[in-house]
Amino acid sequence: MIIVAVAVFCFYILMPHKENKKLVAYFSATGNTASVAQNLAKSIDADLFVIRPTSPYTADDLNWRNDKSRSSVEMSNRSSRPEIATKIDNITQYDVIFVGFPIWWGREPAIIDTFIESYNLSGKTIVPFATSGSTPNTDEAAADIRLLAPKANVVNGKRFPVDVQATELKTWADEFIK
């Protein structure tokens, strides 16, 4: 009996365990989210994907005080779907997808909605993370993503300052990738 128990224990220890395949996908208009996303991907050994708009955002596009700026127009229309210039060839290989973005108007930018709707994310764990100077969390963004990807496991995620340390990112992300 002891020999069997030792054999089972050794088999379990020596058997390779499948680690979740991770992706950090992000949109960054000014570079703040890019910095956090790059640190996150490096700290958890994840693939990195830039959600790049077909038409890059200019400073005028990002002027939230102008109702006619591109970002204001997109964010005032919930059905707006800015076109993405980049594509993930095989999203099925990923188990956990961290989706990063700046908070615009208290939620995710419309290009994130384009990204979410572009793929079958059924069975994936989607973890939003964001940068923002004022919005305290990603709860509204997570709720929006849940509506767009109802068969995915979308968690509430977290907002980070641009100067967040890699160790903090790893500690936070580890709860979703084990």
Residue ranges, per PLM feature:
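Hydrophobic membrane-insertion alpha-helices, especially the h-region
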Residues: 1-10
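N-terminal beta1-alpha1-beta2 submodule of the flavodoxin-like/Rossmannoid cofactor-binding fold
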Residues: 10-96, 106-108, 117, 167-178
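Short, structured coil segments at secondary-structure junctions
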Residues: 43-44, 122, 148-153
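Short, conserved loop/helix-junction motifs that constitute active-site signature segments
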Residues: 91, 117-123, 149
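Glycine-rich, N-terminal phosphate-binding loop of Rossmann-like dinucleotide-binding domains
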Residues: 101-102
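Glycine-rich, phosphate-binding/catalytic loops in enzymes
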Residues: 114-117, 144-146
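Short, glycine-/small-residue-rich phosphate/pyrophosphate-handling segment
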Residues: 127-161
